[in-house]
From Swiss-Prot:
Residues 171-298 form the GAT domain. Belongs to the GGA protein family. One of its GO terms (molecular function) is protein transporter activity. The VHS domain functions as a recognition module for sorting signals composed of an acidic cluster followed by two leucines (DXXLL motif). The lineage of its organism: Eukaryota, Metazoa, Chordata, Craniata, Vertebrata. One of its GO terms (cellular component) is lysosome. It comes from the Eukaryota. Keywords: Endosome, Golgi apparatus, Membrane, Phosphoprotein, Protein transport, Transport, Ubl conjugation. It comes from Mus musculus (Mouse). This is ADP-ribosylation factor-binding protein GGA3. Phosphorylated by CK2 and dephosphorylated by PP2A. Phosphorylation of GGA3 allows the internal DXXLL motif to bind the VHS domain and to inhibit the recognition of cargo signals. Ubiquitinated.
Length: 718
């Protein structure tokens, strides 16, 4: 984030640690420190940049980076101290001095300076317990033999605490009004100023009383949690006395009451108040000890809670597992303790059929899942807000399965019994392709319309569009479903020429007319030759089948089949029946989300995926996120969408239909739903939606329109 003068943290640091510098350039070092104080996330970004520079193979660059770090610790205050005091950054410093990492390749000058900095921080920042732990571990491992001498000019002197400010008297409007009234010589203005001062003093007293009550509540909560936790550690069902059990029951009741008090405190506290973090931490500790009591004493099974998590120590430092862990140099050669990959669920997701044979490599659900690292820490560091939503929501939706196909003869009868009016060239229904010339392979009986609409290609194996000439399983307009192959037509005996019945000829006339319509729309249709080479699967008919067409089409010079020399295939693919995009395979784009609906705490956002589905560059993948920040539950949520006739829209099943009420100590509840939007004509997208839901007990129906979609030319590369 560039601030004044167009400088960013990275540019300041690059100039301050430039290897071509003859000496330390304090102008850029101080500029880097000032930039940290200006930016909201300055300390977090700074420690990441400094860790990279400190591990530089160039000694002078690493030494300058350590000088910058030392200056930042003196000038950037508590926010930077907290970031440096985390294991995430301390581990990077340990790697510099450890021979099992970079210690053998780093100069002694750099390693000595790192050790001096760590030792000086243990003296100047006793509240940062993790720095002390890291330094003592280095001493236990023999990397640090003795404490280094620290010159006075290198000693970290904590900056004085900022002057306490009174938020009541810092109100700019009231201060200006008070100054104007005091300058006035009108007695009425002076009386008004007196009343204003009294009201401001009362507000300040109320604020102080509120802060005092909050501190008292937090202290009482911490004492109860600590005492109950210690009693639970020493609890034994056989040897614990009744008095101990009564005391634990009393402490448990107090904790239950205090939890409601903390909820109220959190809801009354402003988001930018520093005490909100203390309230949330106390609430977490309270929830853990309550769940531990229910598990140990009452024998209840508490879902989703780790009852063995540690409580805060006497200094108030919580050693939770999610805070990271210090590198144990003594056990680096042992197998890592990373959490194993989650086993695939055994229920809820039906087994998918084998993938169809296509010319392109199939993509499976397992391959996309295997790319994700098993550890949750790296995932949390790499993912944005949208990634977290996609990982946490909607992953257990059952995948669509392909129903069994009926035998080929019954499919053929279904086709014959279908009225000719249902043969719509531009509809998503499958249409039988015209047969090839006499020496080409004969086409099998087409599948029924119902089987095409009910048996989409499994989500784990999206297949590319294949030319009509290739007798493979595909989901194109003129191809067959991804289900089992239809039964082969029986071998025709060499009898006299047979002609279809009158009803069959009626169907043939309709199909002939269909081909004529395809000829008229030649601007959109790209004919594909039946003899075009390409990877094909096994023939659908035996090689011994006679070489006459399955249907007696005329192939004279005037017939459309003769003129097109192949099966007509429509150019713009509109159907989305066979397109399914699993939520976990979606990659978020850099495009900003669009707010489609935002009323009464119920909000709907459109997030755009980075890539299009395989073989469908005209389809935009949209992840619809529904969030609830209202104090009431939202139920029976149904979202419907409509687009112009030249486009097609499809909504996949949502991850849920209900949203729980908003809680100030938990992230807002959310629902995700994947929406596919086909736009083969590359027109401007205008989408209308209908949203029905129940907010509390009130039913609502909302209509809206969204036209802020990414440019069509950028689809697939957002």
């Amino acid at each position: 984030m560039a601030e004044a003068e167009g400088e960013s943290l990275e540019s300041w640091l690059n100039k301050a640690t430039n290897p071509s510098n003859r000496q330390e350039d304090w102008e850029y070092i101080i500029g880097f420190c000032d930039q940290i104080n200006k930016e909201l996330e300055g300390p977090q970004i700074a420690v990441r940049l400094l860790a990279h520079k400190i591990q530089s193979p160039q000694e002078w660059e690493a030494v300058q980076a350590l000088t910058v770090l030392e200056a930042c610790m003196k000038n950037c205050g508590r926010r930077l101290h907290n970031e440096v005091g985390k294991f995430r950054f301390l581990n990077e410093l340990i790697k510099v001095v450890s021979p099992k990492y970079l210690g053998d390749r780093v100069s002694e000058k750099v390693k000595t300076k790192v050790i001096e900095l760590l030792f000086s921080w243990t003296l100047a920042l006793p509240e940062e317990a993790k720095i002390k732990d890291a330094y003592h571990m280095l001493k236990r491992q023999g990397i640090v033999q003795s404490d280094p001498p620290i010159p006075m000019d290198r000693t970290l002197i904590p900056s004085p605490p900022p002057r306490p400010k009174n938020p009541v008297f810092d109100d700019e409007e009231k201060s200006k009004l008070l100054a104007r009234l005091l300058k006035s010589k009108n007695p009425d203005d002076l009386q008004e100023a007196n009343r204003l001062i009294k009201s401001m003093v009362k507000e300040d007293e109320a604020r102080i009383q509120k802060v005092t009550k909050r501190l008292h509540t937090l202290e009482e909560v911490n004492n109860n949690v600590k005492l109950l936790h210690e009693m639970l550690l020493h609890y034994s069902q056989e040897y614990s006395s009744d008095a101990d059990k009564e005391l634990m029951k009393e402490l448990f009741d107090r904790c239950e009451n205090k939890r409601r008090t903390l909820f109220k405190l959190a809801s009354e506290t402003e988001d930018n108040d520093n005490s909100l973090g203390d309230i949330l931490q106390a609430s977490d500790n309270l929830s853990r000890v309550i769940n531990s009591y229910k598990t140990i004493i009452e024998g209840q099974i508490v879902n989703g809670e780790v009852t063995t998590s540690t409580m805060p120590d006497s200094e108030g430092n919580s050693h939770c597992g999610n805070q990271g862990a210090l590198i144990d140099l003594a056990e680096l050669d042992a197998p890592s303790n990373s959490s194993p990959a989650l086993a695939p669920p055994t229920s809820g997701i039906p087994i998918l059929p084998p993938p169809p044979q296509t010319s392109g490599p199939p993509r499976s659900r397992s391959s996309s899942q295997a790319e994700a690292p098993p550890g949750s820490d790296s995932t949390n560091n790499a993912l944005s807000l949208l990634d977290e939503e996609l990982l946490c929501l909607g992953l257990t939706d059952p995948a669509p399965t392909a129903p069994k196909e009926s035998p080929g003869s019954s499919q053929w009868h279904l086709f014959q019994n279908e009225p000719p009016s249902d043969l719509d060239f531009f509809s998503p229904r499958p249409v039988p392709a015209a047969s090839c010339p006499s020496d080409g392979p004969q086409l099998p009986p087409p599948v029924s319309t119902s089987s095409m609409s009910q048996a989409p290609l499994p989500a784990a194996f999206p297949a590319p569009v294949v030319p009509a000439s290739a007798p493979t399983h595909s989901t194109g307009s003129f191809m067959f479903s991804s289900g089992p192959a239809p039964a082969l037509a029986p071998k025709a005996e060499p009898k006299g020429p047979e002609y279809p019945s009158s009803s069959t000829s009626h169907r043939l006339d309709a199909l002939d007319q269909l081909l004529e319509e395809a000829k008229v729309t030649s601007g959109l249709v790209k004919p594909v030759s039946c003899f075009s080479p390409g990877p094909t699967a096994s023939p659908l008919l035996p090689a011994s089948a006679p070489a006459r067409p399955l249907l007696p089409f005329s192939t004279g010079p005037g017939s459309p089949l003769f003129q097109s020399q192949g099966s007509p295939q429509k150019g713009p693919e509109l159907s989305l029946a066979s397109v399914h995009v699993p939520l976990e395979s979606i990659k978020p784009s850099s495009a900003l989300p669009v707010t489609a609906y935002d009323k009464n705490g119920f909000r709907i956002l459109f997030h755009f995926a980075k890539e299009c589905p395989p073989g469908r560059p005209d389809v935009l993948v949209v992840v619809v996120s529904m969030l609830n920040t209202a104090p009431l539950p939202v139920k029976s949520i149904v979202l419907q969408a409509a687009v112009p006739k030249s486009m097609k829209v499809k909504l996949q099943p949502p991850s849920g239909t209900e949203l729980s009420p908003f809680s100030p100590i938990q992230p807002p509840a959310a629902i995700t739903q994947v929406m596919l939007l086909a736009n083969p004509m590359k027109e401007k997208v205008r989408l209308r939606y209908k949203l029905t839901f129940a907010l509390g007990e009130q039913l609502s129906t909302e209509l809206g329109e969204v036209d802020q979609f990414p440019p069509v030319e950028q689809w697939g590369n957002l």
